[in-house]
């Protein structure tokens, strides 16, 4: 599961992301915790567990949601009208962001080449998400 890093998670919170996430960070960013009710897909206990499955005190809203890359890309598309196109070329993965705020979403008004070339799709997606958060919304 590819969750966003702590810095991106903080920026997403500041920009209004509020999707249901399977994991959260402590405010210090020191530990990623998983929500058992979401992670297992069934109501087990309404409590958070660390990576070693030891119960942690539930501290509620002070935790910072850690969405997956897929969740963030969907949020950018559906809520912000920004489509992220990640493609592979001979040198690695690159990204272009399209603005799609049209009723039919079949055309775009603007596009931005993100200055990133990475070895993996995930690295490129995270760099692109960070670019969008810092420059476009």
Identify the meaning behind each predicted range:
Residues 120-132:
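A short, charged, amphipathic alpha-helix used as a generic interaction element across diverse proteins
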Residues 1, 108, 129-137:
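Short intrinsically disordered terminal tails
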Residues 18, 37-118, 134:
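N-terminal segment of the canonical double-stranded RNA-binding domain
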Residues 1-34:
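Extreme N-terminal leader/activation tails
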Residues 1-2, 117-120:
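Structural motif
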Residues 5, 69, 122-125:
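Short amphipathic alpha-helical segments that mediate assembly, nucleic-acid/protein binding
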